């Protein structure tokens, strides 16, 4: 039997490349919306694979955490050293409704605060808000020179530092436990808690650069769509939220 080439078998041509498919054709874009406690609600866009068969795109988006500079949310460069984390809780059409997930300082800002000849005071506490969010709050402060001080250094005694730390924890517990998560966000932006700590510790030690360094979300209550829609202004499409003033005050209802 003669053995030769089988002409029925097609041979691939040299130099023929596989067809390149753009991966972005299988993806779709969604708009991320911040809560109305921030001035600018339009955070940005994110993408995910399109819904196919039993795979729903919304399931992959829920729980996604995005990090945004607070300066972009507030429209002011004064907040450029702080980062806010927002968590996607609900998908409405092409809009992703988010909730507050945490706040932190940038690394360069933290390093710029630490200097020689002063004492560092740090405190942290785990607190539950009035709407059952469990948060861990981290505060930071530094000693400063008194008005008539001649000595170069401002190191503090350990007993004084313990008193200051105790006072910091008391103030953080009081300020956080009596407000909701949305009200706490409005307090964190203008540094209300830091100013309260500075005022209360003047008799113990003169302090400077007092900040809530970090807020970490540990536990959240069962998801409530009504509360989230109220936080976003009943699902409104407005790009602007409420501006937080520097002199934030809790709303006190008058007795009927």
Curated annotation (Swiss-Prot):
- Signal peptide bounds: none
Q: Where the protein is mainly located, per its record?
A: cytoplasm
The alphabetical list of record keywords is: Acetylation, Cytoplasm, Ribonucleoprotein, Ribosomal protein
Modified-residue entries (N-acetylalanine), positions: 2
InterPro entries with a match to the protein in the record? Ribosomal_eS1, Ribosomal_eS1_CS, Ribosomal_eS1_euk
Q: Which GO terms describe its molecular function?
A: structural constituent of ribosome
> Where is the protein found, in the record's own terms?
Cytoplasm
Mind telling me which GO cellular component terms the entry cites? Answer: cytosolic small ribosomal subunit
Q: Name one GO biological process term.
A: translation
UniProt keyword Cytoplasm present: yes
Subunit structure of this entry? Component of the small ribosomal subunit. Mature ribosomes consist of a small (40S) and a large (60S) subunit. The 40S subunit contains about 33 different proteins and 1 molecule of RNA (18S). The 60S subunit contains about 49 different proteins and 3 molecules of RNA (25S, 5.8S and 5S).
Q: Which HAMAP family match?
A: Ribosomal_eS1_euk
Q: Which family does it belong to?
A: Belongs to the eukaryotic ribosomal protein eS1 family.
| Protein name in UniProt | Small ribosomal subunit protein eS1B
User: What species is this protein from?
Assistant: Debaryomyces hansenii (strain ATCC 36239 / CBS 767 / BCRC 21394 / JCM 1990 / NBRC 0083 / IGC 2968) (Yeast)
Write the lineage as a comma-separated list: Eukaryota, Fungi, Dikarya, Ascomycota, Saccharomycotina
Gene from which the chain derives? RPS1B
């Amino acid at each position: 039997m003669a053995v030769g080439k089988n002409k029925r078998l097609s041979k691939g041509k040299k130099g023929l490349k596989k067809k390149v498919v753009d991966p972005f054709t299988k993806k779709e874009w969604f708009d991320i919306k911040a809560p109305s406690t921030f001035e600018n609600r339009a955070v940005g866009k994110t993408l995910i694979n399109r819904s196919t068969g039993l795979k729903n795109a919304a399931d992959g988006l829920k729980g996604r955490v995005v990090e945004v500079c607070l300066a972009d949310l507030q429209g002011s460069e004064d907040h450029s050293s702080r980062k806010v984390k927002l968590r996607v809780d609900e998908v409405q059409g092409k809009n992703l409704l988010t909730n507050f997930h945490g706040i932190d300082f940038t690394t360069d800002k933290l390093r710029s605060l630490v200097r020689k000849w002063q004492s560092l005071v740090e405190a942290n506490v785990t607190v539950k808000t009035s709407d059952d969010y469990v948060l861990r709050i981290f505060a930071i402060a530094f000693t400063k020179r008194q008005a008539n001080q001649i000595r170069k250094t401002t190191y503090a005694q350990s007993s004084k530092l313990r008193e200051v730390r105790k006072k910091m924890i008391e103030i953080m517990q009081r300020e956080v436990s009596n407000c909701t998560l949305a009200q706490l966000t409005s307090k964190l932006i203008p540094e209300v808690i830091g100013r309260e700590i500075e005022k209360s510790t003047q008799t113990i030690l003169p302090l400077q650069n007092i900040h809530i360094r970090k807020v970490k979300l540990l536990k959240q209550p069962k998801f409530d769509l009504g509360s989230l829609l109220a936080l976003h202004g009943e699902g409104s499409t407005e790009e602007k939220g409420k501006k937080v003033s520097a002199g934030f005050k809790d709303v006190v209802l008058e007795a009927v």
